[in-house]
Amino acid sequence: DHNTAKTVIDSITKLYEGLGHDDFCKLFPVILTDNGSEFSHPSALEFAPDGRRRTQIFYCDPMASYQKPQVERNHEFIRTVLPKGTSFDSLSQMDIDLMMAHVNSYGRPALGDKSPFEMFAFLYGKKLLDKLLRLTCQRVIPANEIILKPALLRR
């Protein structure tokens, strides 16, 4: 699927409903994004279908990737699996989920050599991590099984 305003709203709503109001608001008090057309309906993202505020949307300045450095670091990891020039068109959602599980299981110096998943569990608890993993079809990859190379998605 292509990212449209509707698919982004649907994804946020799925997370909101799966996490519940309190956990969603704890995890996503603010969403910082770019000015892409998929984020062109901020009120539909900020407010739940029942009208309750669930987050606040803020936009980065154009050409200011430094405003979201951790996202840019994830893009670098994605490019180790899918080098520049590689089409994303043939990727299934399962491929993307697998790749992101490997990316988010990888320890990083900026996180004290912990992975994003480990830091999440430290900050919010394993129970909430497990809930989020189920909702996003993710899983923690053991460190000795992480593959951040094109071979990860070769069939």
Question: Whereabouts are the PLM-identified features?
Answer:
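Glycine-rich, phosphate-binding/catalytic loops in enzymes
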Residues: 48-50, 121
